[in-house]
Amino acid sequence: YLYPGYQGAAYLGSAFNPFQLNMKQKYLAGRSTTKIQKAPVLENLQEQGGRVQGRVSLLESLDQINRDIDQSGSIEALDRYQQEAVDMVLSGRARAAFDIDRESDALRDLYGRGPWGHYTLMARRLVEQGVSFVTVDMPHWDNHSKIKDALEDRLPYLDRAVAGLLEDLKQRGMLDDTLVVVMGEFGRTPKLNSGQPGIPIPGRDHWGQAMSVILAGGGLKTGQVIGATNSKAEHPVARALKPDDVLATIYTVLGIDPQTNFQDFAGRPVPLVDHGQAIRGIL
């Protein structure tokens, strides 16, 4: 998970929590001259062989005390995390995936030199090394004021990063096997407001009745626009879809039945998707 944000496995349990690469440059999308901070994880991915294994053995001995009385499964989940961490430290693949310096200047220019382009390229490297799910958080779209300046600043970097990713995946023969999803949480109000207190420059507020999502790759029938709003982008007037439909489509592309139910730790059945259907015409 590139950048911290809204993450966590919730009722799936801690064994499914993401590995987070906590960088502090996520608000610098529009500053292409910003010197990119190298991932701190690179400094720790040094092979130390016997030293690491010795620490693991000591930890296992200490954990056994709690393991005998653990009823929640948290120790088992922690075991999985620890093993994954050891594998990362001892494997050169992890270090290689995070090391953007191995890429050519031309390719880095294709994605854009700002942090968003940098971490989108890193996402491709992770997928190339076998990571099955990567999230790149590109925040700071909550423009209740100064929306014109904000969008003019950020949209070019988003456009370049996404376009560069799709072009790169296509050239490497990875696009048909990689689903790219670009989306947020909701849309913005059709009408401008007068800005926020202390910042009297127009912006837009939260709007749940309409938004846009980009789906690319994954073997989808792309080059289409599915659905439409009225001329003011207030509400759908054709082919209205819901977030559950987007989720059902993603699960279907991944080969997971969206109608699946699973049990949480309390034994309660939890549906993957509530009433959603995969989007017709793009599968």
Give residue spans per PLM region:
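Ligand-binding pockets and gating/stacking loops
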Residues: 1-283
